[in-house]
């Protein structure tokens, strides 16, 4: 009799526990869903190319892609949303802490962190290593270095900036597929440099003639906008290119696109971006023809770019072809 009564008393407790567990799970699902909607909204508003391309990302890796791209938008917009570089540096440190906690499995209640943590759990369930903390930090450091829009000393410095931002975002995306491939990373490096250089060129009018703070969007996904607390323009073409073309900042501010030498300077920088696209296409043709890429990857051996041994040349060629197809698919021939 006592046992039956005890059983009756315990049943509501088990029911409450079951309800509590279900409610917690439902809350977690809702939180991830809201984070996904937030990240999609950021891409739709500020980075329409990435929003379009997300349809080509495998469903199993799409949350990681959205989180990576939303992360890039948020840190790119820091300069546009703070009043001075000191506050901007504090925001960048917030993102370092956020990424560090997220990769350790302790994400803060921040939409990008929530979605990234969810994506990492999915990758880990498939036996994939975590995304590189160093790559995330590299993007943050590059953005922080140019918070106040200092000029690029030379064209090589602009390429380095593009490598540390746009190319590195592609490395993170490839890792999330998941794909670890020197060949795919090599192609991504050139595509990222072309994209980053083009982004700086396309952002040039906004930087030289900044609109009122916090009222502009970035539909082209550029993210290279002037600090929100300043109406002072900046010409961010490489100084060596400007000197060679005879471009002066004051002429650009006074005459805009008609400034002496400006078109020649822009053409020189754009040519470098186009060179990287040509190189990527040549690499693709070589690989499809069963040849090697044609030149060495300058970042081979660095973090995340370790070489894999395939045994013999034929296996290496086949692996490279499969990796490029998996990494870029229908996008590369375009």
Question: Where in the sequence are the language-model features?
Answer:
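Helix-hairpin-helix/helix-loop-helix acidic hairpins
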Residues: 147-187, 281
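Intrinsic-disorder/low-complexity, polar/charged segments
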Residues: 84, 88, 153-158, 181, ...
């Amino acid at each position: 009799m006592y046992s039956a009564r005890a059983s009756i008393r315990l049943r509501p407790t088990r029911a409450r526990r079951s309800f509590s567990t279900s409610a917690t799970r439902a809350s977690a699902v809702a939180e991830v869903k809201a984070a996904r909607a937030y990240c999609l909204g950021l891409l739709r508003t500020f980075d329409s190319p990435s929003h379009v391309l997300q349809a080509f990302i495998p469903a199993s890796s799409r949350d990681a892609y959205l989180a990576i791209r939303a992360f890039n938008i948020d840190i790119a917009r820091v300069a546009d949303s703070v009043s001075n570089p000191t506050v901007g540096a504090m925001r960048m440190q917030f993102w370092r802490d956020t990424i560090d906690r997220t990769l350790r499995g302790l994400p803060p209640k921040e939409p990008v962190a929530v979605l990234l943590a969810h994506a990492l759990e999915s990758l880990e369930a498939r036996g994939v290593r975590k995304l590189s903390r160093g790559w995330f930090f590299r993007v943050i450091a590059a953005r922080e270095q140019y918070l106040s829009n200092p000029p690029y000393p030379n064209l090589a410095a602009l390429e380095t900036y593009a490598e540390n931002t746009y190319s590195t975002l592609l490395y993170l995306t490839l890792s999330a597929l998941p794909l670890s491939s020197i060949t795919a990373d090599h192609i991504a490096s050139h595509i990222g440099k072309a994209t980053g250089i083009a982004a700086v060129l396309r952002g040039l009018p906004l930087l030289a003639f900044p609109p009122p703070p916090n009222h502009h969007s970035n539909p082209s996904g550029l993210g290279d906008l002037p600090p929100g607390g300043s109406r002072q323009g900046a010409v961010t073409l490489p100084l060596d290119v400007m000197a060679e073309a005879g471009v002066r900042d004051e002429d650009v501010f006074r005459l805009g696109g008609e400034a002496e030498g400006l078109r020649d300077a822009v053409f020189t920088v754009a040519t470098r971006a186009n060179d990287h696209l040509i190189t990527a296409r040549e690499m693709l043709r070589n690989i499809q023809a069963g040849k090697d890429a044609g030149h060495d990857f300058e970042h081979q051996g660095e973090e995340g770019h370790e070489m894999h041994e395939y045994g013999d040349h034929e296996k290496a060629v086949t692996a490279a072809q499969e990796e490029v197809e998996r990494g870029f698919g229908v996008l590369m021939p375009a």
